[in-house]
Every structure is written in structure tokens, then in C-alpha cells.
Amino acid sequence: MTQRRKFFKDSLKASLGLALFSSVSTNVRAESSAAKKSPYTISLAEWSLREWLNSGKITNLDFPETTKKVFDIHAVEYVSSFFKGKETDSGYLRELKSRSDGAGVRNVLIMVDMWGQDGALASPEERIRHAAAQNHHKWVDAAKYLGCHAIRVNASGYGDASYRDAMGYFADGLAKLVEYGAANQISIIVENHGGYSSNGRWLADVIRQVGNEYCGTLPDFGNFRTDLEGGNFYDPYIGTAELMPYAKGVSAKSMGFDHHGQDTTIDFKRMMNIVAAFNFEGFVGIEWGGGLGMPMDAEAAIKATKKLLLESI
């Protein structure tokens, strides 16, 4: 099957899936998950332990073993900044892989954050988009060595471009990078991560334009803020449903908990019903995003998120 034909099928699946999402109650699963093995594997996003990493309590090399020992989670999602510039150091990567393999922990993906011109995949200037795609190649190489299936990138650099223009710029820059990813069998996935990318329809349209099986999304439950200064939000449930047809992972972000152990911003059960409606199978990554003023440390928050996620599946 050609990649283009596959994406036509994905687009049809998107339309059918959204119809299903609209017609099925978001409070009750159409099919009991208790009757079959869960199609999900829980992973942990490294950003959840940013305080431990920034304070020196642990390092990037310690992350896999810490994840297993402290949280009984056996899959990890790295963040580029915690490599501290060692992403091309073969000795460092070898040590990281040795430690993750030794702990029996799966390396899932690397979240790559290059916010300046070096990572501007959506720049209005073609030469900058081209350079940005090449600047991401080292992360594809690192992901491949570590045994990850993907890197996550951002839709950045479009500045004041219009909705349509920014879409075209990013689709072009992303396609350049996806070509390299596909050649190395590493998927390039995009998270809703602010600005236009937090508009589910916009990001889904970008993925359709790229039209490559190695290009997809990483829907994040909590990142649907389209305007940081204005505080504008895209509906997270609609946005997640729009991104799920192209999902190669799911980011279950938590921000705080009430006295019943429920997230204070997102209905996890409703979100996981949406994920299930699209027959997703793969990694669901826990990401502790904050606390909204609640006195909860990272360890307690991650464990609370894991408990809530397991109850919601």
C-alpha cells in the first residue's frame, strides 16, 4: 500500500472516528476494557521529573532505572534538554542504552525542543526550514541508536504568519524532516504544544498534507492553549479526537488533583474513552505538568497520575 493511499484511509478513519466520538457517550465505553488485555503500555515523560533533573538529584542516565524502581513503569520518553549537549556523543548514548537495557526499560521517544531559528520548521523562509530539518537529524540518529520509535518536534518559527500560511510552511519543513526519519525508520510526531499546533484541526491538516506513514501526532491532554498571552483554549476533547487518527503516542498530562484523586483540569475517563474510540494501541505517557499551587511533589503526583490513568483505562 502506498503512503498516499494509506493517508486517504487515515482521513476516512478520521471522519468516521469523529462521528463515532460524537455518537458514543464519553462517560461509558462502547466495549468493556475488562474483557480484554489493555492495548496500552504506560510510559513516563522525563519532563515529569524536571525538578529532580534540574537539581541534580538524578541525571538523564539515571532516568530509566529511576522510572522502574520508583514508579514501576517500564518505558520512558526523553526530553532533549536533559541530554546536556551529549546527543551526538557515542559513548554517552552507549551508556544510556546500556542502562536502559539493564533495567529492562523501553526507550520510546525523544521530545525535541529547539525553539530558536535552529529548530524553526515552520519558518516563512525556505532556507531556514531546510536548515531546521537538518538540525533535527542528530536527534533522529540518537533515537535510532537508543531503540526509540520516534522523535517529537514542534511547530515553531512561523511568527505572525496567517493560519493558512503557517500551515503550509510547517507542512513543508516537517516533510523535509520526515523524509530523513522515514529513511531511518523513525517517526516524526508533533504534539499540540501552543500556538496553531494547539488547534486540533490545524495540526491534523498539516499531517494530512505531509501524507507519510512516518509522520503523526502526539496528542497531549493539557496542551490546548492556543494563545499564551490571551489565555485562549481550544476544546481539549474535540482537539484530541481530531488528532487521534494520526496518533503514534498519547501524552496523559496531569496538572493537579482534587480530594478524590481526579485531575482538576481534565476528565481522564472521558479522554481515554476518546482514545479507545479510535482503537489506539501503543504508549500512553504520563506527564506531570505542574500543580496549580497544590503542595504535591513529583513522586506523589506521578503515582497519583498512574493510579488515575489505570482507573480510566
Residue ranges and their predicted role:
Residues 54-69, 131-141, 232-240:
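Short, acidic/polar
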Residues 10, 75-76, 165, 171-273:
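Acidic/histidine-rich catalytic cores of soluble enzymes
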Residues 44, 67, 100, 132, ...:
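Conserved, mostly hydrophobic/aromatic
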Residues 70-71, 146, 245, 278:
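Structural motif
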